[in-house]
Amino acid sequence: MILTRRQSLAGLAGGALLGTLGAPAIVRAQKKPQIGIVVKIGGIPWFNAMEVGIKKAAEEQGVDAWMVGPTQADAAQQVRAVEDLIARKVDVIGVVPNDATALEPVFQRAQAAGIKVVTHESPDQKYNDWDFELTTAQGYGDAHMELFAKLMGGEGKYIVYVGSLTVPLHNLWADFAIKEQKEKWPNMQLVADRFGVAESMDDSYRTALDQLRAHPDLKGILTFGSQGPIGAARALEERGKEKSVVLVGGFSPGQGVKYVKDGTIRGGFIWNPMVAGEVFVRLSTNLTKGQTPTDGMEIADVGPVHVDPAKRLILAQKLESLDKENIDRLVTMGL
């Protein structure tokens, strides 16, 4: 069964599909389901694109869904945002966590209040109902390292950025990438512990400058976090290192297109944050109807969905290449 944007992500577990995830809601007299989605930080292109998907799916579903964007990538701000949504008595709270552990107590309070909790980019999250991912952790980490190692010629010194040292998924991507490097490209050398700066363009910029000074022979920067490539690219161009240092990572295409076209960012991979926003709303809407995802379903434009009920995890694998051949198409899509 193929699920379009107007069809269900999942049927009822072990039974017939009683509703559809993505189908327009029938207008009823009762209050529309309320869905609040808290992202890592507001005002950056990645989450702006996610908000477009949230709004689109909300209209499609006939629900009230909105995005809450903290002013900083700060765990305490996310906790306060979730507390506010609990006080509003919403039906579902969605979160892209900055710090999975810091959110556990407030997620417990949400569930105690009868509110469903859905996360993204936090596959081992506690006290949520479901987490969904549009790539597998190993697939994402390995894809980046394979490209990175090829461009570095399989040798040389490199550093790694993640969005934060407390974002589990970013660190899992880095773990898989580094493991892949050690197994396949032993002549590459990680010269520092990973840096938790890639949700801030300014921090990524400053860290790149610092590491270029500390390691004049640095040959590569691999970054997981959408602002990492942008900040590092600024630093490389400022220091005249854009040709000698390989820069690879995921970012919002509209923000990084200039650096791809001039060769400073050599490539990377992303999933579509607009689709992630849509899935947030569709999954949440189905949960308000008592429906549960089932293994083997497909999402249009994403592909097959693997559902692991024991881990409360929904997995797909759909990556877009951030290279000169594909970047304009992604920018045209509004990413």
Predicted regions and their residues:
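A residue-level marker of the well-folded mature domains of exported/periplasmic proteins
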Residues: 8-10, 28-335
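N-terminal export signals
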Residues: 7-27
